[in-house]
Structures are given as C-alpha cells and as structure tokens.
Amino acid sequence: LDLERMKTVLQDEAEIDQRIYTFPTSSIEEGGKKISYFDYISSLKNPDCNEALKRVCSRIDLDAIHNFLEGVPELLPIQREFYLTMLTERKEKILDYSLKLLMEQEQHTSPMLGM
C-alpha cells in the first residue's frame, strides 16, 4: 500500500478488519478456492495447525516487533504504525481468538481431573 492508503486504513476499523478477515488469503485451497487465514485457523479442524497455534502464540513478542520496527530507519512513522497495527490486530483477532476457542474446546472434551 502507498502511504496515503495506509493512513486511510488506519483511520477505519472496517478497513483494518477487511485486511484480517478477507485478505490476504492463504495459499491453502478448499473446493478450489483460497481460504482466509481466519477461517482456516479458527475452524480448529487441523490438529497440526492447532498444535502450531499453541506453540506460536506464546512466542510472539509484540514489544520486540515494535522495537525491531523502530530500529528500521528506512520506515516512515506511518509505515511503522501500519505494520505494528496490522500485526497486533491479526494476532489478537486471528491467533489469540483461535487459541481461546481451542482452549475452550479442549476443556470441554477432556475429562475433568480430580473426580
């Protein structure tokens, strides 16, 4: 995106959400159609993906990402804000949301301890 488009996206939650839920799409196809990351990950239908979700979520350090972006002198402030916003929103709305669903699913399907 050009700088003006980045500003527009950052000012509109619907634009941000479109970049989370609608595109980009993954290279994974179902029924000949590329699927969204959100739909695939939050479906919890792939056990390998679910295990990767558990491993990855705890390792994402948004502060470290912020510090990294701050250290790239070629980036303009609007670019830093855009990238950090998109990464933060995608983590929260795709990964954290899906992990919460997974934890709830596992809690309901595993036998209660101590009974």
What are these regions (language model features)?
Residues 1-115:
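C-terminal catalytic region of ATP-dependent kinase domains
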